[in-house]
């Protein structure tokens, strides 16, 4: 029996929707990255994009454990001398909650062309609504919710 190697045209990409409400940021990011890479499929191959589309809703309600809201920072650089900008996770979450999730998830993908293609299949929305109902996304449950 020969080893099966998936081809780019043979792969079907399903759609998953994840509700981020009260889910710990890192636990959500690892599950989303796993779906984007396609490691949940028996036909996974590291050199082919076998992953699925992931829609994350309620990004503004994601949970941060401990004091990360105030003590963990998000850095970005303009490219100019002295252009380093630093914001706490809380500031980023208040202003652009989808950016925090996108950075966490994309940081868990490969740093090459294939990883960038996988990152394009990630759709993050701050609220409960998303424009992808026509794709019939299947709910994906994450069991790492924070008890309040």
Swiss-Prot record:
Domain of life assignment: Bacteria
Question: Which terms does the record give in the GO molecular function aspect?
Answer: mRNA binding; structural constituent of ribosome
GO terms for biological process, alphabetical = negative regulation of translation; translation
- A single GO CC term, please? cytosolic large ribosomal subunit
Keyword Ribonucleoprotein tagged: yes
Tell me which UniProt keywords the record has, alphabetically: Ribonucleoprotein, Ribosomal protein
Cite the residue spans of the region called Disordered.
128-148
Name any one Pfam family assigned in the record.
Ribosomal_L13
| InterPro entries from the UniProt entry | Ribosomal_uL13 (IPR005822), Ribosomal_uL13_bac-type (IPR005823), Ribosomal_uL13_CS (IPR023563), Ribosomal_uL13_sf (IPR036899)
Using the record, list the residue span of the signal peptide; answer none if the entry has no such feature: none
List the Gene3D superfamilies hit by this protein, alphabetically. Answer: Ribosomal protein L13
Q: Which CDD domains match?
A: Ribosomal_L13
Which SUPFAM superfamilies does this chain map to?
Ribosomal protein L13
On subunit structure and binding partners, the annotation says:
Part of the 50S ribosomal subunit.
Q: What does this protein do?
A: This protein is one of the early assembly proteins of the 50S ribosomal subunit, although it is not seen to bind rRNA by itself. It is important during the early stages of 50S assembly.
Name the NCBIfam families on file.
rplM_bact
The record's listing under PANTHER family reads: LARGE RIBOSOMAL SUBUNIT PROTEIN UL13M, RIBOSOMAL PROTEIN L13
Q: Which family does it belong to?
A: Belongs to the universal ribosomal protein uL13 family.
Write the protein's name: Large ribosomal subunit protein uL13
Organism (species): Saccharopolyspora erythraea (strain ATCC 11635 / DSM 40517 / JCM 4748 / NBRC 13426 / NCIMB 8594 / NRRL 2338)
Its taxonomic placement starts with: Bacteria, Bacillati, Actinomycetota, Actinomycetes, Pseudonocardiales
